[in-house]
């Protein structure tokens, strides 16, 4: 709006003397002289009044236009303020949703931590039981070594089948043959019985002595044979081959149990790693992890003032509705050299060694394998120990 200078000339009223004029009052002669040119002065005053009115009208028009513009800008500002209020309300709603999601995630994380604690407690108990079993196995090995060194076994041998000599069987056959004619004699008449009875008594008395002698001889031979058999059985039981076989069996059983426990621990470790990776990806996505990594690197650099500064050019976008600003940031520094990664072949032996070391480190660090698998391991080890004791 342009600055306009407004000059207003006031018209003096007739009959009042001009206050600004100084000096004595005019004489009647001078008054007459001044009254003559009054017509020309009045015309000039009328023209100046018209000019002043036109200027006032133009100024009023400009003021009205400026007021209209101010009203329009005020209406636009009100619309923008309403839009900003809507955006703020939407942001508040999103923030409330984010707070609810954060609360739910915190609850899930707390539950997961409780489960992990329970699993760690169960793992500690199972580990204690496994250590006890290992101690018992060591004690058994020590006892076995001492027994092998002393050779103080007490072996009970039971013989079910007892072979009788041939003479005793002959005497039994003779007794049976004697019993048969006695039964036939009962069927015969009374007159014939006394003679046959006498003959039978004579035969039985002669053969009884022979049977007693045969029985005594057979008992002595049987005792000798049983003693010889027992000695042979003891020799076989305490032979070096038998002891070596028992040692080999015990070692094989122990190796089998160790291999089974290692395999089960590796399986549980793999399953737990998969579950933890799945939970980690659910809780923290990959993009979030990368952002956290970059923020950690930035914090580390900020705490180390002597770090190397690399040159970079970055474009950032800032959105302030209804405008979008593209800002390009250029930083001077050294050229960053990317390190090339080398691929190394890994053999099967290296994989096995790495798996064994990983399992050992997981056990030392207190990794939490599955409880059911560990209980199955303990049951299998108990079954192997029972089989070993039965075989011994």
UniProtKB/Swiss-Prot annotation:
Which keywords, in A-to-Z order, does the entry hold? Answer: Acetylation, Cell membrane, Coiled coil, Cytoplasm, Endoplasmic reticulum, Isopeptide bond, Membrane, Microsome, Mitochondrion, Nucleus, Phosphoprotein, Repeat, RNA-binding, rRNA-binding, Transcription, Transcription regulation, Transcription termination, Ubl conjugation
Q: Where is this cross-link: Glycyl lysine isopeptide (Lys-Gly) (interchain with G-Cter in SUMO1)?
A: 163
Identify the GO cellular component terms for this protein: caveola; cytoplasm; cytosol; endoplasmic reticulum; membrane raft; mitochondrion; nucleus; protein-containing complex
According to the record, the residues making up region (Leucine-zipper 1) are 55-77
State whether keyword Ubl conjugation applies.
yes
Briefly state the protein's biological role.
Plays an important role in caveolae formation and organization. Essential for the formation of caveolae in all tissues. Core component of the CAVIN complex which is essential for recruitment of the complex to the caveolae in presence of calveolin-1 (CAV1). Essential for normal oligomerization of CAV1. Promotes ribosomal transcriptional activity in response to metabolic challenges in the adipocytes and plays an important role in the formation of the ribosomal transcriptional loop.
Share what the entry says about its subunit structure, partners included: Component of the CAVIN complex composed of CAVIN1, CAVIN2, CAVIN3 and CAVIN4. Interacts with RNA polymerase I subunit POLR1A/RPA1 and TTF1. Binds the 3' end of pre-rRNA. Interacts with transcription factor ZNF148. Interacts with LIPE in the adipocyte cytoplasm. Interacts with CAV1, CAV3, CAVIN2, CAVIN3 and CAVIN4.
Q: What name appears for this protein in its UniProt entry?
A: Caveolae-associated protein 1
The organism that produces this protein has a lineage beginning with:
Eukaryota, Metazoa, Chordata, Craniata, Vertebrata
């Amino acid at each position: 709006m342009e600055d306009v200078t407004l000059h207003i000339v006031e018209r003096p009223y007739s009959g009042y003397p001009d206050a600004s004029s100084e000096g004595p009052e005019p004489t009647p002669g001078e008054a007459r002289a001044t009254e003559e040119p009054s017509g020309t002065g009045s015309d000039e005053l009328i023209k100046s009044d018209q000019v002043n009115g036109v200027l006032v009208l133009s100024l009023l028009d400009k003021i009205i236009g400026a007021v209209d513009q101010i009203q329009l800008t005020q209406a636009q500002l009100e619309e923008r303020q309403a839009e900003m209020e809507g955006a703020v309300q939407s942001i508040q709603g999103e923030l409330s949703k984010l707070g609810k999601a954060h609360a739910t995630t915190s609850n899930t994380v707390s539950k997961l931590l409780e489960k992990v604690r329970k699993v760690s407690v169960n793992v500690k108990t199972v580990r204690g039981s496994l250590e006890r079993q290992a101690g018992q196995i060591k004690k058994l090995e020590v006892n076995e070594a001492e027994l092998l060194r002393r050779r103080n076994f007490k072996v009970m041998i039971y013989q079910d089948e007892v072979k009788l000599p041939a003479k005793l069987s002959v005497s039994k056959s003779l007794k049976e043959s004697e019993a048969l004619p006695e039964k036939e004699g009962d069927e015969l008449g009374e007159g014939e019985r006394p003679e046959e009875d006498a003959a039978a008594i004579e035969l039985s008395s002669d053969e009884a002595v022979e049977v007693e002698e045969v029985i005594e001889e057979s008992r002595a031979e049987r005792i000798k044979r049983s003693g010889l058999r027992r000695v042979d059985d003891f020799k076989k039981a305490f032979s070096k081959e038998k002891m070596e076989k028992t040692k080999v069996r015990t070692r094989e059983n122990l190796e089998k149990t160790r291999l089974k426990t290692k395999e089960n621990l590796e399986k549980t470790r793999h399953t737990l790693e998969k579950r933890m990776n799945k939970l980690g990806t659910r809780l923290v996505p990959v993009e979030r992890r990368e952002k956290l990594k970059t923020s950690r690197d930035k914090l580390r650099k900020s705490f180390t003032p002597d770090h190397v500064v690399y040159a970079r050019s970055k474009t950032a976008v800032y959105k302030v509705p209804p405008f979008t600003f593209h800002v390009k940031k250029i930083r001077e520094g050294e050229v960053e050299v990317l390190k090339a990664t080398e691929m190394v072949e890994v053999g099967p032996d290296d994989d096995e060694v790495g798996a064994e070391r990983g399992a050992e480190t997981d056990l030392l660090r207190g990794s939490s394998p599955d409880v059911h698998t560990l209980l199955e391991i303990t049951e299998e080890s108990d079954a192997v120990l029972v089989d070993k004791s039965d075989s011994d």
